[in-house]
From Swiss-Prot:
Localization: Secreted; Nucleus
Tissue-specific expression: Expressed by the venom gland. In intravenously injected mice, the labeled toxin has preference for heart, liver and lungs.
Species per Swiss-Prot/TrEMBL record: Tityus serrulatus
Disulfide bonds: C33-C47, C40-C53, C46-C62
Record's function text: Cell penetrating peptide (CPP) that increases intracellular calcium release through the activation of nuclear inositol 1,4,5-trisphosphate receptors (ITPR) of cardiomyocytes, thereby causing an increase in the contraction frequency of these cells. In vivo, this toxin is not lethal to mice, hovewer anti-CPP serum reduces venom lethality, suggesting that this toxin is lethal when it acts in synergy with other venom components.
Protein name: Intracellular calcium channel modulator CCP-Ts
GO cellular component, one term: nucleus
Length: 68
């Protein structure tokens, strides 16, 4: 087999493996976001894109974003 062809095949395989590993890593980091009026852990917790985690006294809930 042509050595240049082997190098190209090797690079394609390596690129595919790296892309697959990155996709798995991103999936493992992703978590389900809370929805409107659902409890959340703190100001940084994940709510859906139109909401944010807001303190309502002693607890936090996902509420509609305020302002711009």
């Amino acid at each position: 087999m042509n050595p240049k062809l082997l190098i190209v095949i090797g690079l394609l395989l390596a690129t595919g493996v790296c892309s697959f590993a990155k996709a798995l890593d991103e999936e493992s980091l992703r978590k389900e976001c809370n929805h409107l009026n659902e409890p959340c852990d703190s100001d940084g917790d994940c709510c859906t894109s139109s909401e944010q985690c807001i303190s309502t006294g002693s607890k936090y809930f996902c509420k509609g974003k305020q302002g711009p």
